[in-house]
Structures are given as structure tokens and as C-alpha cells.
């Protein structure tokens, strides 16, 4: 089992890095504003048709464009979901969503969270899936990448007042990165057996003679961007454990690679854009080290399983509950860590059925801000916040003004960094407390004990950190839960983006100073250790008390 786990992790990472390096070079060209071969004329025509001026924006205009773009997307998606009963491509005649579910869903997909308080096959029409949810899968991913582009330019430029053009970044990322790769992945999924049609649901008779319905729909096209854009919202309620979404072991691997592809590529792009590839590799190494340790822990917890199984006559204590037999424990464990390390949230197994420790690791990966690869764009700018915090701590220890890539980190940057890092923990802890203190919050809990608290903590952690996965065991389609989670999703997304853009504007205006003998190298093993320690320390100090009340207590009750 250990050898199989090692081979699975090693082969996954090798293929990932081989794919991410060339994509990183493409992203670096987009960051630098270089014209891509063969598309320059297309872009110029597009700017003219759309009325996009090619002048660059300062950080305030860039931020305003991002906020306006996403707010308009929220309004449009909310309207589509409310009115889907009278819109086309609705062969099952599904009615419009309730106002609070429509609001929750619209916020969820615009904020790149894809939390779902509904079952897709019984709630959302084909038109809503394609024109609403799938479109936002592209646009929310492009938003995260655009913000990352702006922050990377801030480190790469000197004495600059602008960070690029938001409209051009959103358009170029969508047209030349997200759409082509999604098309390739979608065609591969169709070849492997994922469905892509507009048929009405198909009736069939089971072996027991019961009549049931097979849901249909344009699944493969949405599945591709769902994974590539670290969105995660499933076409069906079973998400990537459904054979129509994830039909084979090969598609399972491709889905995991798609989740990490752009976050890993952005690390390479960062190194290329700032003129020092070692800087990007240091961040990538930090992410990889934490990721490998977390995967190993989950695999160990799930293969060790529940010792009480043996006393009840089971052949093995290994925990196969809630997992697809065609994927098994190792692939399910790897998928769980990949989807929660990134802000994806897609699942090929039910996280609620993992062991206490096996479920705690995915929860903790979300709680530290999903900076271990993380979401497209958001993972890199989230980790760069920890980089700034790490060099600040190092500067305090050696008595020097902290600096990164030659740029001094002043009070303004540290205030914004602290604000961005503290937003999601505050939302998680306050949201969980509110849910546990109110009758409306507790009414949604199917498990009132220790595990019930873990389910609530997981749900709010998932929403505030824009992941979207769930433990289950929670009746979330109520006004209280829909509004609470919508609040956490929206502000967990944009109250981080706002200080990140402020940091970008401040850093872009600074000149890079040449390195001196006392400058902390930010590309070696020492810095990788410092950055890893910073991430772990912040996560430990913030969430250990809450985790002790949930999964830790549950584990201790199991082994006592």
C-alpha cells in the first residue's frame, strides 16, 4: 500500500509539473502584455468591437472594474435562476429557484465557490447550467487570474502607477487559456464516456422492476471548466463520483491534474515575470511540501480506518465508506486533498464519511486560506500574502526592514496583508458561532453531536474560503443557511481581493533596491522552511481550538 501511494503521488506531481511549465511560459507572456502568435489581429478587432481602450489602469480603477464586473454577473445569474421556469432548454419543466437559494447559488458561482444547497439534476435547467453557471465558471476563474496578474506586475515593475487593463486581462485569459484547454478536456471526457446532450431525462427499469429516470444534459463541457477553473460545482448532486461526470480512472486523474494545472503554472509564470525563476520555484516547493504531507496523512488515516470494524467482523479496518470502488481509497484520498488544497470543492467521495483525521486535513487546508496551490489566481496571491508576512517576521528577528524582491515592505503593506489574512478566519469562526448559537442554525443539523459541529465548521470554512465542498449532514437549503453562507462567500472573496489590490498598487510604485549582504534570500531552502512555518503557524493558532472541539475530539472518542 505504501509503495502504491508513493507511486501515485510521485507520478501525479511529475505529470503536473511537466504540463504546468509550458503553460507558465504562456501566462508570463500574458502578464507582460506580449502579443500571442496569430491572435494579435483578432484581439485588436475585439477591443474595437467591445469598445475596450488599451490604456492601463491604476489599482483603484482595476479593482473597480473587477468589482463591477462580478456584481453585474451576480445580478444576471440571479435573474436567470429566478426565471428559469420560463426560459428555454428546460425539458423537465423545472421551476425557478426560491429567492434565497437563487441568491446563494449566484453568489456561490460568481465567487468561484460553487457551494450547492441543491441537487443539480432536480433543480437547475440546462439553460441555467450553460448560460448561467458554466459562464460564471469561466468568468470567476478569469477574475482570480486577473488579480494575480496585477499583483505579479506590482513585483515586476518599478516606480509604476498602473497594473494593466482589467478588461484585457479578463478577455485574454478567457479566450487564450481557459476556453482552449477546457475544449480539449471536454472532448477527452466525452471520449471516455461523459455525457453531452440536450435530451430529456431517460426512463428505465431497474433489475428489481422499479421505474427510475436517468438524468441527461450537457455535462462534459461544464465538467471541464469546473475542474480547470477550480470551481467544483457538479452538474449532478453526486459531483465527480457520478459516472456521467467522471466515468473512468483516467478521467479521475485528468480531473485532479486540471485542478492544479493553472495554480502550478502561475508559480512558474511568477518567476518568469519577475526575472528570477527561483522565486516561483520556492513558492511551488512550499506548496508541494505541504501538499505531500497532507496527502500522506489522509491516505494513512483512511487505510488505517476504524479499528472497531474488526471487532464487528469486517475483513479490514480500511475505510471504504462513501468511496467509489472504481477509485479506491488512495485515489479518493488524493482527490480529497487536491480539491480542498485548491479552491475547487469537487468531490469523488463523500468527505463526511472519512475518518475524523482523514476529514480534518481537507478542512484545515481550506482554513489556512487554500494557499497550497489554491484556486486559479487566488492560490498564488494568497501565498504571496504569507510571503510578505514571512519576510516581515524574518525582518523582526534580524532587526532589518523587511523586503521582498528588492522592495521594502512598509506599514501600509503589512496592514493590508494582516487584513487579507484575517478576513476568512473571522468569517469562519464568527459564522460557525452564529450557527451554533441560533435555533435556525442548529435546525439544519442532522447530527447534533461532535460530528455535527464538524459539519457546521466545515460548511462555513468551505464557504468563506471559496471552496464549495461539504461534509453533508446539513440541511442547507433554508433562508438562514443560504444567507449566512452567501455572506461568507461574497466577503470571503472580495474582502481579500481589495487589500491584495491595495498592496499591488503600493508595491508597483516602489523601486527595487539591490540586494545587500544582510538581505534574506527568498529562493532557498531556508526561506521555504520559513514560509512553510508561517503558513502552519497561522493555521495552528487560528483554528486549533475549533478543530479540537470537532474532528480531534471525534478521533479521541474513537480510539479511547
Swiss-Prot record:
It is a multi-pass membrane protein. Pfam families: KdpA. InterPro entries: KdpA (IPR004623). Keywords: Cell inner membrane, Cell membrane, Ion transport, Membrane, Potassium, Potassium transport, Transmembrane, Transmembrane helix, Transport. Its main location: membrane. It is found in: Cell inner membrane. GO terms for molecular function: P-type potassium transmembrane transporter activity; potassium ion binding. Disulfide bonds: none annotated. The chain crosses the membrane at residues 6-26, 63-83, 132-152, 175-195, 250-270, 282-302, 327-347, 356-376, 379-399, 416-436, 483-503, 524-544. GO terms for cellular component: plasma membrane. Part of the high-affinity ATP-driven potassium transport (or Kdp) system, which catalyzes the hydrolysis of ATP coupled with the electrogenic transport of potassium into the cytoplasm. This subunit binds the periplasmic potassium ions and delivers the ions to the membrane domain of KdpB through an intramembrane tunnel. Belongs to the KdpA family. The system is composed of three essential subunits: KdpA, KdpB and KdpC. This is Potassium-transporting ATPase potassium-binding subunit. It comes from Cronobacter sakazakii (strain ATCC BAA-894) (Enterobacter sakazakii).
Amino acid at each position: 500500500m505504501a509503495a502504491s501511494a508513493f507511486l501515485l503521488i510521485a507520478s501525479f506531481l511529475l505529470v503536473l509539473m511537466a504540463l504546468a511549465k509550458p503553460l507558465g511560459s504562456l501566462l508570463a507572456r500574458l502578464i507582460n502584455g506580449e502579443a500571442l502568435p496569430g491572435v494579435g489581429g483578432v484581439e485588436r478587432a475585439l477591443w474595437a468591437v467591445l469598445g475596450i481602450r488599451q490604456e492601463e489602469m491604476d489599482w483603484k480603477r482595476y479593482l473597480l472594474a473587477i468589482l463591477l464586473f462580478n456584481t453585474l454577473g451576480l445580478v444576471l445569474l440571479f435573474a436567470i435562476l429566478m426565471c428559469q421556469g420560463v426560459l428555454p432548454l428546460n425539458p423537465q419543466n423545472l421551476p425557478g429557484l426560491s429567492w434565497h437559494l437563487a441568491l446563494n447559488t449566484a453568489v456561490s458561482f460568481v465567487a468561484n465557490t460553487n457551494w450547492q444547497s441543491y441537487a443539480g439534476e432536480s433543480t437547475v435547467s440546462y439553460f441555467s447550467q450553460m448560460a448561467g453557471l458554466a459562464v460564471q465558471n469561466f468568468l470567476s476563474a478569469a477574475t482570480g487570474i486577473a488579480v494575480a496578474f496585477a499583483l505579479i506586475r506590482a513585483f515586476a515593475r518599478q516606480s509604476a502607477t498602473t497594473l494593466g487593463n482589467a478588461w484585457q486581462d479578463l478577455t485574454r485569459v478567457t479566450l487564450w487559456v481557459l476556453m482552449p484547454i477546457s475544449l480539449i478536456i471536454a472532448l477527452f471526457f466525452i471520449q471516455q464516456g461523459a455525457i453531452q446532450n440536450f435530451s430529456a431525462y431517460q426512463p428505465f427499469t431497474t433489475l428489481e422492476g422499479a421505474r427510475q429516470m436517468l438524468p441527461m444534459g450537457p455535462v462534459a463541457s461544464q465538467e471541464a471548466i469546473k475542474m480547470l477553473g477550480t470551481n467544483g460545482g457538479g452538474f449532478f448532486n453526486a459531483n465527480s463520483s457520478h459516472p456521467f461526470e467522471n466515468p473512468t480512472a483516467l478521467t479521475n486523474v485528468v480531473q485532479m491534474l486540471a485542478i492544479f494545472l493553472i495554480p502550478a503554472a502561475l508559480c512558474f509564470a511568477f518567476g518568469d515575470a519577475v526575472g528570477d525563476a527561483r522565486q516561483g520555484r520556492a513558492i511551488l516547493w512550499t506548496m508541494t511540501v505541504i501538499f505531500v504531507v497532507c496527502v500522506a496523512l489522509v491516505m494513512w488515516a483512511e487505510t488505517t480506518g476504524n479499528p472497531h470494524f474488526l471487532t464487528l467482523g469486517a475483513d479490514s479496518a480500511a475505510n471504504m465508506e462513501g468511496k467509489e470502488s472504481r477509485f479506491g481509497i488512495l485515489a479518493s484520498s488524493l482527490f480529497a486533498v487536491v480539491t480542498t488544497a485548491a479552491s475547487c470543492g469537487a468531490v469523488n467521495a463523500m468527505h463526511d464519511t472519512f475518518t475524523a483525521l482523514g476529514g480534518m486535513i481537507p478542512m484545515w487546508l481550506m482554513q489556512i486560506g487554500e494557499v497550497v496551490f489554491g484556486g486559479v489566481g487566488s492560490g498564488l496571491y494568497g501565498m504571496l500574502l504569507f510571503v510578505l508576512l514571512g519576510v516581515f517576521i524574518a525582518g523582526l528577528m534580524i532587526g532589518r526592514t523587511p523586503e521582498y524582491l528588492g522592495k521594502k515592505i512598509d506599514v501600509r503593506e503589512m496592514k493590508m496583508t494582516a487584513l487579507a489574512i484575517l478576513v476568512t478566519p473571522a468569517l469562519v469562526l464568527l459564522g460557525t458561532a452564529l450557527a451554533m448559537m441560533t435555533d435556525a442554525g442548529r435546525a439544519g443539523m442532522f447530527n447534533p453531536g461532535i460530528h455535527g459541529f464538524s459539519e457546521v465548521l466545515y460548511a462555513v470554512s468551505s464557504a468563506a474560503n471559496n471552496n464549495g465542498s461539504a461534509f453533508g449532514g446539513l440541511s442547507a437549503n433554508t433562508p438562514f443557511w443560504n444567507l449566512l453562507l452567501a455572506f461568507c462567500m461574497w466577503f470571503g472573496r472580495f474582502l481579500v481581493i481589495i487589500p491584495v489590490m491595495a498592496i499591488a498598487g503600493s508595491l508597483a510604485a516602489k523601486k527595487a533596491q539591490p540586494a545587500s549582504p544582510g538581505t534574506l534570500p527568498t529562493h532557498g531552502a531556508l526561506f521555504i522552511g520559513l514560509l512553510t512555518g508561517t503558513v502552519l503557524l497561522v493555521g495552528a493558532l487560528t483554528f486549533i481550538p475549533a478543530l479540537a472541539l470537532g474532528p480531534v475530539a471525534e478521533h479521541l472518542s474513537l480510539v479511547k
